[in-house]
Amino acid sequence: MMYKAADFVGMLFLARDVAHSVHLNTRSYSKHIALGIFYDRIIGAADDFAETYQGRHGLMGPITLHSATKTANIIDFLQGQLDDIEKCRYEVVDKSDSSLQQLIDNIIEIYLRTLYKLRFLA
């Protein structure tokens, strides 16, 4: 799939929605906390990316709102999104645009820290 900035931000909005849903339905306290931190941070990171992108390129247009497919396993869901982010990052933003690429690095860091907590601390 060819990603544009609006698709990328929409993917992050979906991650927030899925993580929040699992956060509210888990019986694991550590999973509850890890996902709470994720959904709080990912929406701020999405906002930072969107505003910075629009500062450089102008308005990106309507955000693509994705719907979740079956998300029985939050680790698989987040890992799949992380894989997509790492594959599409240079389609979304030119590799030479270090300011926007750094914001994508920050987004990747949020995913990796959450995956660590879910895999090894939950």
State the predicted function of each range:
Residues 6, 10-13, 17, 36, ...:
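Generic structural signal for well-ordered, non-transmembrane alpha-helical segments
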Residues 32-61:
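Conserved alpha-helical segments that form or flank metal/cofactor-binding pockets of metalloenzymes
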Residues 22-25, 29, 39-42, 63-67, ...:
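Aromatic-enriched hydrophobic runs in primary sequence
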Residues 14-36, 91-97:
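Helix-loop segments that flank and shape redox-cofactor active sites
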Residues 2-10, 29-36, 68-72, 98, ...:
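Short, solvent-exposed segments of well-ordered alpha helices
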Residues 1, 121-122:
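Short intrinsically disordered terminal tails
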Residues 65-119:
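Acidic/histidine-rich alpha-helical segments that form the ligand environment
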